[in-house]
Design a protein with these regions (language model features):
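Core dinuclear metal-dependent hydrolase active-site scaffold
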Residues: 1-66, 130, 147-157
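Cap/insert and terminal regions of metallo-dependent hydrolase folds
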Residues: 45, 52-146
Length: 157
């Protein structure tokens, strides 16, 4: 369940609430729990939002568990907006999530692998960069990675 935790060898893993739903077959809608994840060890915290629509759950996570150093925030699979809004964050909402979490860094996820919705495959990172600029945020602290790319600077700071 949300907020339960498992601790092993100095690592704490905790599921957190997010706005979404679950379904694996035609007969099991919302029979299992969906979640984000906070993973904490020594002096570093990583938050994985997973599949999520924008909600106050992100602020609630910070209130309970503190700000993550690094967050993986979805930026894709958002069009048509009227249908996808409750379950998938768009790039502009991803910037709001980043601010809600108070993360030091973020990586945009949930885009560019499969054509899931109507927006062009390469649109989410372009819109993210624009949204960051509008918000006055440096695109070097919230970025997208190419498949296989690493970002070692996050762990070095």
């Amino acid at each position: 369940d949300w907020w339960q935790q498992v601790q092993r060898k100095g690592v704490t893993i905790q599921p957190t609430p997010v706005q979404h739903w679950s379904k694996r077959t035609f007969f099991d809608r919302n029979k299992t729990l969906w979640s984000g994840w906070m993973i904490q060890w020594s002096d570093f915290a990583f938050y994985f939002a997973g599949d999520a629509g924008y909600s106050s759950d992100f602020r609630q996570t910070v209130e309970k568990l503190g700000n993550p150093d690094l967050a993986a925030i979805p930026i894709g699979a958002y069009e048509p907006r009227d249908f996808m809004k409750s379950a998938h964050i768009n790039p502009e909402e991803a910037v709001r999530v980043f601010n809600d979490l108070g993360a030091k860094y973020a990586i945009g996820i949930h885009w560019g692998t499969f054509k899931l919705t109507l927006e062009p495959m390469n649109e989410p990172p372009v819109r993210l960069k624009k949204a960051l600029k509008v918000a006055g945020l440096d695109s070097r602290i919230f970025r997208t990675l190419k498949h296989g790319e690493t970002w070692p600077a996050v762990l070095q700071n």
